[in-house]
Structures are given as structure tokens and as C-alpha cells.
Amino acid sequence: MSDFFHSDVLSVSELNAFAKSLLENHLAGLWIAGEVSNLTRAASGHYYFSLKDSRAQVRCAMFKGAAARLAKPLKEGDHIEVSGKISIYEARGEFQITVNEVRLKGLGQLYEAYERLKAQLQAEGAFAAERKKPLPTRPQCIGIVTSLAAAALRDVVTTLKRRAPEIPVIVYPTPVQGAGSELQIAQAIKTASQRAECDVLIVCRGGGSIEDLWAFNEEPVVRAIEACTVPVVSGVGHETDFTLADFVADVRAPTPTGAAELVSPNRQESLHRLAQAQGRLKTVLEQRYFDASQKLDWLARQIRHPRQKLDEQRASIGKLAQTLSYSMKQNLRAHTARFERQTQALQHYRPDVSVCKNNIVRLQTALPAAFSQLLTHRRQSLTAQAALLEAVSPQHILERGFSVVKNTRGQVIRNADVLKQGQKLHITFADGETDVRVSKEQGQQDLFDCI
């Protein structure tokens, strides 16, 4: 730059280049407000127009890429705000703005309010991942907060019917743009939360200009989503549109259709996954069955059938029986041979058996007579001895008139001279007994007195 000031003379091109450098380096990032005039739209899709106010104007060029991002086409007389590259067209030395963005006049204040609320919510942790609620894998009911006339509602319902026709849908109708729409949207969200009829809630609307979507940047809507007890999926505008509702929602979908796809299990995909799982399960079960069959076959080979075991035992018993029979026959033959040998030996050394047999017969005949004679003799001898014993028995003597006299000690009194007067005696007769007392000495009359 100092080279320009030290030069004596500048060419026109140098002047224009210097001016262009100053403008591009020091006037970047500005927003310029004005009214559209002299609007021309080329066949290529570029816009050429002037932006003017009451005292001045500046030429503007908006190329096809930037023009495609417009919410709606520019028209003569629009009051807009533009941002872009401020420069000079060097060939003609014309001052111009190459426009990159366009917004309606007044949106600058809205954007400032947007940034303030966003910063506040950020500081409060409203966007924190840890407060996000997970979406249900298979919801039993899906709620939708949107306008009944919105194309977004048709898109969402069509997608849900295609993917999960068995899931019921509840619509909480509300205007989604216009004055006061933010309060009605917030109230619809609160109603869905209070009723707790749904497992997940879609808050959506179709695409539009920033002004059309602005209700979803308003604090009532953002606070209602933040306080909602039901997981919320936002599907506002197109994929390039971002609102504060997107930031505070539990999940942000790029479009309403995308929101419907997020909350609904794809029936075909579920059936496909189920078929795959079924196939894997079948493979596992078949492998387990094969392994079990192999193991069972191996065990069956290890375990003999009871009939086989019985046959083996029966065969073993048969062999043992044969062995035992053979052994018994052998023993019998051996004992028979031994008996025959001993019989032959006895026959060689025995006495005359017939003589002994005759003697035995004779003795057997004589034995009863001899025994009877002996018995008679013994009976006669016993009778004689009994008569003798009877003759000398004390009882027989007493029956002949005798008696037995005993003192008190049981001693028999054989002589009268041993008696004393007054002595007690016991006398035994043949037919009884009695006690007496000695009343007189020997030689006196009435020797005894009966007691």
C-alpha cells in the first residue's frame, strides 16, 4: 500500500485494483439493507439488481448457486438485507456487491434474539446430551404436533402406514406459522405430555422461509419441548434448516419424513431381520442337534443293550453248566471207580457174611423171648422187695398199734426214763398226731396229759 502513495501517478487499473483490495479486506461480513430495483434474472439463473435507499444505490450480482438457496424468488420492491463480497468490477470501475445471502429486512433483530436465546439455553444445559431421552424401539403409539393442513402431516402419516401400519397415531393439531402460532404449538406439546397417550412425539412442519419457520425458534415452543415427558423428535423444514427446537429436541430429523422413519420400526426390515435371526437360530439348532446326535451315537456305542448283556451272561452260564456237569461226571466216575475198588477189597478180606446173617436172624428171634423172661423176673423181684419194704415201713408199724414219740426238738423218745414231768412231747399215730405233756414220772399212773 505504501508503494501506491509513493508513486507519482497511478493508472486507472492500479486505482481500481487498490480500491478493490481495500473494499474486500476491510468490508467483509457486513449486512446491507435496501430496496430491490432494476431487477433482472438471467437465463443462467443469476440475479442482477440494484439495492437502494432514499439517497444512494449500489449494484448487486447474485449468482445461480446463491439464488438457489432463496426461500422465494426476489421481486421488484422487496426490502431485503444482503451479505456478500463488497468489491469493484475493475474493468469498468463499478462498485458492486456479490451477494451470498439474502434475508427480509428486520430479520437481523430476530437473529440477534435467536442468538441470545440459544446462548441462554446452552448455558442452562438444555442442549446437553445427558438430558436427551432415548427413543422407544417399538412404540405403542406415536403422536404428531403439526397443522392438519400441512403437507408434512401427509408425509409423516404415509411413511408410518408404510413402515408400521399396526401402530396407532394421534395428531395434536396446531397452526405452525403466523402470529401467535408459537403459543399454540407449545400448548399442543404440553397437551401431549400431560395426556401421556404416546410413547414418542413428532413436532414437525414442511419447508419454508426463515419467517415461516420462526415459530420453532420462539422460547415457548423450546421450553415446551424441554419440559415434555415424552421423547420428542423434531422434523422442521428441510435438511439445511436448523431451529432451536431441533437443538432442544431429544432427536433432530432432517425432514418430517425422516422423523417418521426414526420413530417407526420398518416392518419389512423387521421381517427381514426376523428372517435372518430365524435362519441363524435354525443353523445353531441344527448344529446343536447334529452335535447331540453324534454324542448320543457315541454313548449308544459305549452302552451295551441289556439283551446283549443277558445273552452274554446266558452263554457264560451255559459254559459254566457244561463245565460243572463235566466235573460232576468226572467226580462220579472217580468215586464209582474208588467204590468198586474198595468193594472188591472188602470182598477179598470180609468174613462169612451168610454166617453172620444167620446169627443175626437167630439173635433177632431169641431177643424178644429173652427180654420178656428178664422183664418177668425183674417184676417178681420188685414185687418181693416192695412187700419187704412195706413190712418194715414206719407207717405199717404204726398201723399195727405202735406210735412215735418225739420231744420238741424232733428227737425220738426211746426210753421213758429220759422224760421229765411237765415236758412237752409230740406223738404220731397211724391216723394222726397230737401234743402231750408229761404229768408224772416213770412208774406213776397217767404218765401223759393231753395238752
Swiss-Prot record:
Subcellular location per UniProt equals: Cytoplasm
| A GO biological process held by the record | DNA catabolic process
CDD domains assigned to the protein according to its UniProt record, in alphabetical order: ExoVII_LU_OBF
One Pfam family in the UniProt entry: Exonuc_VII_L
Which EC number(s) does UniProt give? Answer: 3.1.11.6
Q: Which GO terms describe its molecular function?
A: exodeoxyribonuclease VII activity; nucleic acid binding
UniProt enzyme class = hydrolase
Annotated Gene Ontology cellular component terms = cytoplasm; exodeoxyribonuclease VII complex
UniProt keyword list: Cytoplasm, Exonuclease, Hydrolase, Nuclease
Please list the reactions this protein catalyses. Exonucleolytic cleavage in either 5'- to 3'- or 3'- to 5'-direction to yield nucleoside 5'-phosphates
- What role is this protein assigned? Bidirectionally degrades single-stranded DNA into large acid-insoluble oligonucleotides, which are then degraded further into small acid-soluble oligonucleotides.
Family the UniProt entry places it in = Belongs to the XseA family.
Q: How does it assemble?
A: Heterooligomer composed of large and small subunits.
- In Swiss-Prot or TrEMBL terms, this protein is called Exodeoxyribonuclease 7 large subunit
Q: Which gene encodes it?
A: xseA
